[in-house]
Regions:
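Nucleotide-state-sensitive switch-loop elements of NTP-binding domains
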Residues: 2-13, 18, 22-169
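G-domain G4 guanine-recognition motif of GTPases
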Residues: 102-104, 133-138, 178-196
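C-terminal-of-GTPase-core extension/linker across diverse P-loop GTPases
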Residues: 157-167, 173, 178, 187-202
Length: 202
């Protein structure tokens, strides 16, 4: 990849507990020969997801290529955090060949995707795809998130969050922006639950 080639970015979205970190860990361990970088969007004093991913670092995705945005929901802190983080990854040597972004469970993908049109970065990176993870059992039950209390605690802890969007609307935004939707934990949902979840998403 030359410095003139746009760097592809895959956005991975889904509620807390839907399996985003597990998917990214799998992709890190199976990079297909590409140098990866990862942006983990979380907030609070302890970066649990970031620590988990850094513990899985491999030569194709060393720990210094794993950056955390811990100041709040990525869709609400684009100018202050997201753009500088992208620029920092672009400046790494060797330069990453693909960036994975794990959004917080409350992030609205649409504002984040619009950020890729910012003048500072639009000529250098491109959205390769958006993957939405959905807990099959939670979707089938109409909860959307596997642990509503944990999601609400996450919402309360984020001072930068500038939207009070209901979980159903956040879910709709995640699904409508997705190029690929993965139903996770199918063993907990069972065949009937998976069928209901598919009907709801469709």
């Amino acid at each position: 990849m030359t410095d003139l080639t746009k760097l592809p970015v895959t956005v991975i979205t889904g509620f807390l507990g839907s399996g985003k970190t597990t998917l990214i860990r799998h992709l890190m361990q199976n990079p297909g020969g590409k140098r990866l970088a990862v942006i983990v969007n979380e907030f609070g004093d302890v970066g649990v997801d970031g620590d988990i991913l850094k513990s899985c670092a491999i030569p194709e995705c060393p720990a210094e290529n794993i950056l955390e945005l811990a100041n709040g929901c990525i869709c609400c802190t684009v100018a202050d955090d997201f753009i500088p983080t992208i620029e920092a990854l672009m400046a790494l040597s060797p330069r990453p060949e693909h960036i994975l972004i794990e959004t917080s469970g409350l992030a609205l993908p649409k504002p984040l995707l619009k950020a890729f049109d910012w003048p500072d970065i639009r000529s250098r990176i491109t959205v390769d795809g958006v993957i939405a993870l959905a807990d099959a059992e939670a979707v089938a039950a109409g909860r959307f998130a596997p642990n509503i209390d944990a999601v609400e605690a996450q919402r309360a802890a984020d001072d930068s969050l500038d939207h009070e969007t209901p979980l159903s609307e956040v879910f709709e935004d995640q699904i409508s922006c997705a190029d690929l939707i993965l139903l996770t934990k199918p063993d907990l949902a069972g065949e009937d639950g998976i069928a209901r979840a598919k009907d709801i998403i469709a």
